[in-house]
């Protein structure tokens, strides 16, 4: 082994030790706290990124946090609709969900995507349990109310008992965003919304949305304009001023709503960055946008 190689290894090991040392106060601070992660976007489609997210979730559990993973699965739903000859339709950004589409959504999210994530977490050394809103009356749905979108729902109620039981015993709940109303009719609910409502009901330490953007940007075309930290008032001003627009509006609104109901901090981060979760939670700088209930408290 060359001298340069030895020096490189020493530097790499020193960096690893530095990272662990920097993480220690955060590990101590968040031990026993609940972190709700919404998993979606490119991090679900890229197998390498998927592996890193799974390992990050298991790491959180191993160091004493209580992670709860909520997932979507739009691309796989579209793939199966195509295979079955059902046209995917959208209205105002929402998937039009008629009865045949609802059957496919439930089959894909609950039967395929959810169980794949559970299996991957278990293979990585975690203890995952797959759920949808129907299990243990976890989520009660109601119609979203917009005309012509079918069985698209909103969260009417969250029963946290099953989540608390699992998380307090070392299990990692993995939740798909399908739920039923009081009559048993299934509804497709936006996964960001489900994550936000679960975080609020649990009084979670953090809500983290994995997205395909750096966070809130002053100029959406320039990743260098990332806004690292805002409070609820500033977040609302960014929406009203048009800085937050398009698909970011429901994400920021979801964060603001959860904070108003008691979540300590909400984060919008880029799931395409390797180990984005660990970088955001356990480093001094973070990598995305953190939204707080009041002025940087």
From Swiss-Prot:
GO molecular function: acetylglutamate kinase activity; ATP binding
Biological process terms in GO annotation: arginine biosynthetic process via ornithine; L-arginine biosynthetic process
Compartments, record wording: Cytoplasm
Underlying gene: argB
Family stated for the protein in its record: Belongs to the acetylglutamate kinase family. ArgB subfamily.
InterPro entries: AceGlu_kinase-like_sf, AcgluKinase_fam, ArgB, Asp/Glu/Uridylate_kinase, Glu/AcGlu_kinase, NAGK-C
Enzyme class, spelled out: transferase
Transition state stabilizer (site feature) positions: 38, 251
Protein name: Acetylglutamate kinase
Source domain of life: Bacteria
Organism: Trichormus variabilis (strain ATCC 29413 / PCC 7937)
